[in-house]
Amino acid sequence: MLEEENSQMICQIYRIYTKDISFEAPGAPQIFQKEGSPDIKLDLDTSSNLLAENTHEVVLRITLTATIEGQTSFLCEVQQAGIFFIKNIENMQLKHCLGAYCPNILFPYARECISNLVSKGSFPHLHLEPINFDSLFMNYVQQEAEKQNESDPIIIKNSEQD
């Protein structure tokens, strides 16, 4: 019984915090005179690092760039981070936990920060749709596997006999 408890997979949140935040409206106030909906470009990235044994920091970076008629309306960047205690999770499961599970936890906090920044910048309400981090992670794993297969050398043995 005790052995089962010691081998149970654990992923606990120690802390969630905003690591870095930035909002720019380089075209203000002239941009407020333009009509139409802005084109929104979303860049997303995750990273993680080991802080101590079984303790990981995961950072979700979201950068939004809004343009109207080719002019930048606003640029918003949020780095939402969390410290997670992760135990008895190894290899691919650990990569999935750090690359998909933890970012899923962080995303609502980042989305709220972005929404608040955009509205305080006097721009129309912006609601980011949920992101399927599991799917993004699986695509990443597949791309890495394809890169690995492409970089594996092909060895052709020529066994000519005289």
From Swiss-Prot:
InterPro entries: SecB, SecB-like_sf. Gene3D superfamilies: SecB-like. Pfam families: SecB. One of its GO terms (biological process) is protein transport. Keywords: Chaperone, Cytoplasm, Protein transport, Translocation, Transport. One of its GO terms (molecular function) is unfolded protein binding. It is found in: Cytoplasm. Disulfide bonds: none annotated. GO terms for cellular component: cytoplasm. PANTHER family: PROTEIN-EXPORT PROTEIN SECB, PTHR36918. One of the proteins required for the normal export of preproteins out of the cell cytoplasm. It is a molecular chaperone that binds to a subset of precursor proteins, maintaining them in a translocation-competent state. It also specifically binds to its receptor SecA. Belongs to the SecB family. Homotetramer, a dimer of dimers. One homotetramer interacts with 1 SecA dimer. This is Protein-export protein SecB. It comes from Hamiltonella defensa subsp. Acyrthosiphon pisum (strain 5AT). The lineage of its organism: Bacteria, Pseudomonadati, Pseudomonadota, Gammaproteobacteria, Enterobacterales. The gene is secB.
